[in-house]
């Protein structure tokens, strides 16, 4: 049997058995993933069952106790509170660009972990991501210190527009519908803009996210700690939470309503996530995985307002989520240079093409493969 057909047969079998990942067969199927009642806290519980952190915090193959450090954590106590008992390797790597941070871990070292990491991703010193992170750290020194004020002004402006339009919608008789529309659009834009602040240290703007009736704390789990770190894998909560209504993972036994997900999504979920599954290494560099799993939009990345309110500069944002969106455009040259050097599969598209693409993903039942030379 040709290698491609053989792999597809094995992948289909793994998908049906649900004992391991399809693309990463060395990993067990995520605990609690298919429970009918799903929420961020349950996702954390399932992760704790699989990570071998023994009630502590795991970074790579070592266990640490940050209990005495929690209140002193520069990013806020909440991050450590949420992740206790889990493997935080990806979160630690992505959220700490300064190389001196890793040296501080020695103060809290307890012992080596007893089990291998339940993650396929690597962070080798000469790999794509760590090389990029070192280059970004140096590049940040050349970026104006006040550049993030642009995002602050945009966010504050949208917030004030929401307050004014909401007040007028309730107060005036004429043009009330117009003010309703302005308030609704402002709330939608503000919700996305606040996403910029949820990734970072505790700050007042992240609480504005709650005006959407979503919880910023839950979003920190499902989006920041799950989707950002395990993008488009079985461990991605933003994939598993949509099931059994939407199925982005390909499977031959996908139910009819799953194949008609482009209809379901307009009824159940307002945000679109493009999924791209290609055959890759079973232990990929984390940064290269992010580049492969995401598409940037050339019609969005050229405008600071659009970048902030429409999830722009998505590839760089996924790899350096704590950086303000206004900073990311300065990192394009070094990012593209290293993508070429490491032959990372960086791709750009348009907003329209991505909307069409994510609809096609909900309808797909077969695996995508590529020829490996």
Regions flagged by a language model, labelled:
Residues 134-138, 142-213:
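Well-ordered mid-protein domain cores that form the structural environment of catalytic cofactors
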Residues 1-142:
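B-type heme-binding environments
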Residues 182-371:
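Membrane-embedded catalytic scaffold of the fatty acid hydroxylase/desaturase
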Residues 109-118, 361-373:
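A broadly tuned preference for mixed-charge, low-complexity surface segments
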Residues 41-44, 67, 176-178, 204-208, ...:
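Intrinsically disordered, low-complexity segments enriched in polar/charged residues with Gly/Pro
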Residues 120-129, 153-161, 245-252, 357-364:
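Amphipathic alpha-helical surface "interface" segments used
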Residues 117-119, 150-152, 347-353:
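Short, flexible loop/turn segments with low-complexity composition
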